[in-house]
């Protein structure tokens, strides 16, 4: 076998007959498989041991030679080579076909490659191949046309007319083979190039397509006649096995049936030819052979598929590759692995952030080899076999050994569906009793796990390297930030939030108010003994608290609560004391009003202070983000554990529960509803009198009920008691929101019908009062729609993620700096008055392209090519700068990836991105993972305002990434200038917009009902929208440059996600959009050897032009092409990646004709062939490092180098560091 890690590339071509013979170990002549009595393979049959190798290791068929010592000997009795039985997976056979047969991929595919090569229509080809017509091979001196088609009857007439032997015409694949042999590629290509200079319309399109195919044959060295098969390869028997079932029956792969059919028909044809049978019988047999081979290669592609028992279509070779169950997606891209298990998860509140609980019986099975090795090493038993017995018996001694083996050995936990990389994280196992895996409560958010019966899978990394990677890169304590937006993903939730909320509440007049304590311990003791309440405001000496006080704050009394003292206890030392839940307190420290000189009047000071709100979920998130910024991961994960324990402890002490008495009653609910009823009656009256349309009536009624519900909601909020448990749960962000609250205490309101339309009759009751039967029915109506939507959305979102991953999987950080001279000018994204994404958010974590100066003073804020930190971004915005030119993925020059400077920081770590990071996959996951949170609906703008629906949510994201024509498309102008007039034409129900500019005038027809974005006298830029709606990106590309289109798409995606409250970093969308626009269509080849109309990678296009320009020739011109992600995935340079994505047969057909080479640059193609992926530690620059032991003393104090040997490169691999440093002395 070839060593996969030694491959540079992989090529696919058409197989020539001689190639097929060179693969084969013998001809399969009989259709038999195995003998039903002996169960041994038949000679010369489909499972023959002589051809394919022995069925038992190191043993020939007759049993003369047994054991490994005879390896390589071919038995003189039975002819079987003594070798491993594994060769039955790799040795091929062949069938010599007695008549040539066409390959269905090349004849039937779209476009038909055979048809284009011969310039014949697919229908004519079909008639010839399946013996329904003759084709003229050589007209000789007759007036017949070369390649003309004639029926049996016409053929006989022509023979009578011109005499026998006066011309040559044949039928079947043999005729096509003769024609293909006659094709002179060079001559045809030259003629087509000439024709292209003058041709137009349909003729030109056809010529371009033919030229493409002929050029592919010419350049790849494939011969066109190889599309016709004279010899058929037989795949190894272990890839089409026969298994004995209990009961003596056999289960066999469908391929065996299909091969049997071919062999039977081939043998029958041979016999008929020997007997010199009548032509019509031979023809019929040849046609049947052709159909049998078609079925073997792609059953069902032409005519009715061949079926097996129960009229099930048989799975042919093509079906073995296609689809989710095919070879690519089922066995090559994802495999089942050993050393894995799965179980239900339960909560493990006592675990540390980096730990998970593994049941003992699971652990002993997973770590069995490690335990056995240790048993032998300790001389408890002598050999592995005995050790295995010991483990299986459950000997007492194994448990201590297991404890030691799992120490420092991380395991991976995964929860399906794995929507982003946080769906697999590493933990240190802790042995527990029971059968459920224990999971830390804080990692639930990343996994989207809960404990209502979810299951998780566990995997054991085996090699030293795998363990090191799991420990350093994948440990759960390291994953504090979410890769999609750089915000903490591990924030306390539910009980933890509630506990900390309760702990930090302030109340006036509770016991112990105004007491002063000398230190923390005294305050806590007073609280424990019941002298002071947790929420009472008290004083404490600042000197006793280990916090960064200023000089004025020292030797003072701080006014706070016992709860806040406990809350601040868990915070790291360098962090200010947290008294108010806001960012100012977090970054700048406690405001002066909370300090009192020693001996001051504390009661008076307290009475002058307002009560502070407690710390909510959002505040806790901000605290965690700030701590991460200052102290990085280790300290943050320790703090999170302390915050979790504190939260659980105090939510238990508080004992907050929900009872029916906690749901308040709104006194004037009846009046509000009465008023609305009256208004609805008035509206109905107006409609009956014909004053308003039905649509207007419907909108007014629904708006009225919405207003009633909002009124009730406002009353509830105004009258809520901050100590009400439901209000506390809601306000803290632990569970529930105002909508839930108003359904419990106000009214349920309007419901959606299954068709998405809102029903006019509202549900007036709330859950406290209870619903009537009719109301209950209405609410199930709406609820059912919610459930179906969710189910459909999940599938849609998953498929979107798959397409995104596919298009971007080869985008990897390849170098430090690409040295580009272009940048992207960015400003905040806004829609009307609404801010979508601020400039500060867009700048954070990016590199500048140009110097940024203060607009007033001219002082330099930040130089070129510098990283913009959070503080710098704030400084830039505060200075009043509105637009900044930054390094962007759009303008990066790196081939097959991005450079570090154009990408900026890795949002998951907050540091500059490392070379080797697979940013394409991260981007795809970041956009796909929140997909399920987006709505499905097409948004109705109230039925009146516009004539089209605006697509939103998930369908809009798909529309953008697939570059489809949007629903409700906006009309755009191609002229830059002034809108001179807008005329309405009542007869055609349209408006005309006139734009006058320096370069010319434009006249645009827009629908009568369209909402205008411009008015007379307004200035418009090129490509600006004249009406409301979405711009079609392909049209925008025709009038503007590539960067404008990329910027537009980026803004549109952000609008959809931000409107749903989902934050995604710009860079992820940039990576995706760049992948959609990396191809060029050649308009004029100039002096290059490119073909007109070819779609090619922009880098290859530039290279071809470079070579021509150096030689002094005319460069080619091309036009950038915007492709949807599905099309872009299929057009990628890697045929392995494209074939494993969609349309497998089409991709492979095309690749084979072109003789495509896959340079294995992406992740998918390397996974498929089993090579380590070229990202992360798999990159060549990291693979070539040899680790060696380092003397610690020398490492810390390196010896002084002598002069003269500066060239040596010393590489130090330090296991505690993620990156590998190359230090050149």
Swiss-Prot record:
The keyword Zinc is assigned to this record: yes
Xref: InterPro entries: DNA-dir_RpoC_beta_prime (IPR045867), DNA-dir_RpoC_beta_prime_bact (IPR012754), RNA_pol_asu (IPR000722), RNA_pol_N (IPR006592), RNA_pol_Rpb1_1 (IPR007080), RNA_pol_Rpb1_3 (IPR007066), RNA_pol_Rpb1_3_sf (IPR042102), RNA_pol_Rpb1_4 (IPR007083)
Enzyme class: transferase
One cellular-component annotation, GO: DNA-directed RNA polymerase complex
Cofactor binding, note field: Binds 1 Mg(2+) ion per subunit.
Keyword tRNA processing included in the entry's annotation: no
Residues that hold Zn(2+) 2 according to the record: 818, 892, 899, 902
Sites where the protein binds Zn(2+) 1: 60, 62, 75, 78
Chemical reaction(s) catalysed: RNA(n) + a ribonucleoside 5'-triphosphate = RNA(n+1) + diphosphate
Annotated SMART domains: RPOLA_N
Xref: SUPFAM superfamilies: beta and beta-prime subunits of DNA dependent RNA-polymerase
Gene Ontology BP annotations: DNA-templated transcription
Residue numbers binding Mg(2+): 450, 452, 454
UniProt family annotation: Belongs to the RNA polymerase beta' chain family.
Summary of subunit composition and partner proteins: The RNAP catalytic core consists of 2 alpha, 1 beta, 1 beta' and 1 omega subunit. When a sigma factor is associated with the core the holoenzyme is formed, which can initiate transcription.
General function of this protein: DNA-dependent RNA polymerase catalyzes the transcription of DNA into RNA using the four ribonucleoside triphosphates as substrates.
Full protein name: DNA-directed RNA polymerase subunit beta'
Organism, scientific name: Streptococcus pneumoniae (strain P1031)
Highest classification ranks of the organism: Bacteria, Bacillati, Bacillota, Bacilli, Lactobacillales
